């Protein structure tokens, strides 16, 4: 009997799985993540640059994505404890929503837009100031008011005398349509930033849950590798005993020893992958540096019954926070266009002051001044025309981005439906493959124990079971990730991720 070259195939399968998981995670984050910076405005992207949310960025360099994406980082809270932290999926999501860097930056962006809103309102609200002054003056009447003929009793130079003046000043815009439209535009930008913050929370849930599921998958890999190592150890001991009894050849002992060493190596790699994936999860949820933890939530296979595709699309268009955010940006751009056109309109403002003036504080008396100012723009050097061109460009760009996002949502929902159908079938097939591979291994071990065959058949059966376990773990991870992706695609990730994972 000729031994099949199973080792290169196993190494290729393990490497392919690692590459697939890495690409899935990177592409998931890149496709789902909206650009965090400039989310409250309509910032242009220069030709040749790649934004954080583009698939090209993720494919170019996954490590760069991990270093630069704010959703993969977090602000550590508290100090690490010596005891292991029990971390459930709900706890991980809660920590992520509080400490994830993407959410914190998005919250700061809302505060920034609220500040811009107040700046825009300041052009419409009253501006009230007060001032007090005191000075000593000496006046040359001849030089100041042009008295050339001496006046009896009036000296040519008066003073020195003091002047004390304290008063309040009021400046109020009565009519300025440009400022009104810009204030309304800033209000739309605040709403856009608030929706962007909600969208950031959705993305945080996807990132945290995906990383938590990866920890579960890696932990399952460790358990599978440990079981396979123990099985290989039993085979090695059994083969060694049979050789001592003269029932097995030396090559059978070597073959079982090679298999045992391979399983030891795979266990080492699996434990290392689990430890590194825990670090990724800890960073995303803001755990203190060096904090050890154990996951406590088990996510088993639960079939998900979904609504129809048309219903899911309608829910997405009405629920997605990023779609609402961009809709508000379109509205803001429309108001900016109106504001640019309003620069041609006249403006009316009122100014007034009231105070007390005199040579000193004791001899003051009240005075008041009031005036109205009407400004009629005639020619402003082409500035109004330029502002209108800029506003037109921003409005066109915002509308194009909204239509593109609508098409992107349609594609995303359809993709998740396809992924759910495909991965559900994968899980079913993988479960059957594990069952058959387990039976095959048991029968091969029985045949070897009975002396019907050598241990080549047992080694091959162990390889088949290892492949089947790897496939099942990967398919279950992809299926659960597809559930969370569907919740995100519809706009319910934060509120319904747990229900989707439970198949409800």
Predicted regions and their residues:
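A glycine-/polar-enriched beta->alpha junction
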Residues: 94-104, 111-127, 160, 167-185, ...
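Bacterial Sec-pathway N-terminal export signals of envelope proteins
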Residues: 40-133, 139, 289, 296-330, ...
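Periplasmic alpha-helical coiled-coil/stalk elements that build and connect Gram-negative outer-membrane
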Residues: 201-315, 419, 423, 464-466
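Acidic, low-complexity, intrinsically disordered peripheral segments
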Residues: 2-26, 36-58, 138, 289, ...
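Small/polar, glycine/serine/threonine/aspartate-rich low-complexity segments that form flexible
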Residues: 45-48, 74-85, 131-172, 295-309, ...
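Transmembrane beta-barrel architecture of outer-membrane proteins
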Residues: 88, 112, 163-167, 210, ...
């Amino acid at each position: 009997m000729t031994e099949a070259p199973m080792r290169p195939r196993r190494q290729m399968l393990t490497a392919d799985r690692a590459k697939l998981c890495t690409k899935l995670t990177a592409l998931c984050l890149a496709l789902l993540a909206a650009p965090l910076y400039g989310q409250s405005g309509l910032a242009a992207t220069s030709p040749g640059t790649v934004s954080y949310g583009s698939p090209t960025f993720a494919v170019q360099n996954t490590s760069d994505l991990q270093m630069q994406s704010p959703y993969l980082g977090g602000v550590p809270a508290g100090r690490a404890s010596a005891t292991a932290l029990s971390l459930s999926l709900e706890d991980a999501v809660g920590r992520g929503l509080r400490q994830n860097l993407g959410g914190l930056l998005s919250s700061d962006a809302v505060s920034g837009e609220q500040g811009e809103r107040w700046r825009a309102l300041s052009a419409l609200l009253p501006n009230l100031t007060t001032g007090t002054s005191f000075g000593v003056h000496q006046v040359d009447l001849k030089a100041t008011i042009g008295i050339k003929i001496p006046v009896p009793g009036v000296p040519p130079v008066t003073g020195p005398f003091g002047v004390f003046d304290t008063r309040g000043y009021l400046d109020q815009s009565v009519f300025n349509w440009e400022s009104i439209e810009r204030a309304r535009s800033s209000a739309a930008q605040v709403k856009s930033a608030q929706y962007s913050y909600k969208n950031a929370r959705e993305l945080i849930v996807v990132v945290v849950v995906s990383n938590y599921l990866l920890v579960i998958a890696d932990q399952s890999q460790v358990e599978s590798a440990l079981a396979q190592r123990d099985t290989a150890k039993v085979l090695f001991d059994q083969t060694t005993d049979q050789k001592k009894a003269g029932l097995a050849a030396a090559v059978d002992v070597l073959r079982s020893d090679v298999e045992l060493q391979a399983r030891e190596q795979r266990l080492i790699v699996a434990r290392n992958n689990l430890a590194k994936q825990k670090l990724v999860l800890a960073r995303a949820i803001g755990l203190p540096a060096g904090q050890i933890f154990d996951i406590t939530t088990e996510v088993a296979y639960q079939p998900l019954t979904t609504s129809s595709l048309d219903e899911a699309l309608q829910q997405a268009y009405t629920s997605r926070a990023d779609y609402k955010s961009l809709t508000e940006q379109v509205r803001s751009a429309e108001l900016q266009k109106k504001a640019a056109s309003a620069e041609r309109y006249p403006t009316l403002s009122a100014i007034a002051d009231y105070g007390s003036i005199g040579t000193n504080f004791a001899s003051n008396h009240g005075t008041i001044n009031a005036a109205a100012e009407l400004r009629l723009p005639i020619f402003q050097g082409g500035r109004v025309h330029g502002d209108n061109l800029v506003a037109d460009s921003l409005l066109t760009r915002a509308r194009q981005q909204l239509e593109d996002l609508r098409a992107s949502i349609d594609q995303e929902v359809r993709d998740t439906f396809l992924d759910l159908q495909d991965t559900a079938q994968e899980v079913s097939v993988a479960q059957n493959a594990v069952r058959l591979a387990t039976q095959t291994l048991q029968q091969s071990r029985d045949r070897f124990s009975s002396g019907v065959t050598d241990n080549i058949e047992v080694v091959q059966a162990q390889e088949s079971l290892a492949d089947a376990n790897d496939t099942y773990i990967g398919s279950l991870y992809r299926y659960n990730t597809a559930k969370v992706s569907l919740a995100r695609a519809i706009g319910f990730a934060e509120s319904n991720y747990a229900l989707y994972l439970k198949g409800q």
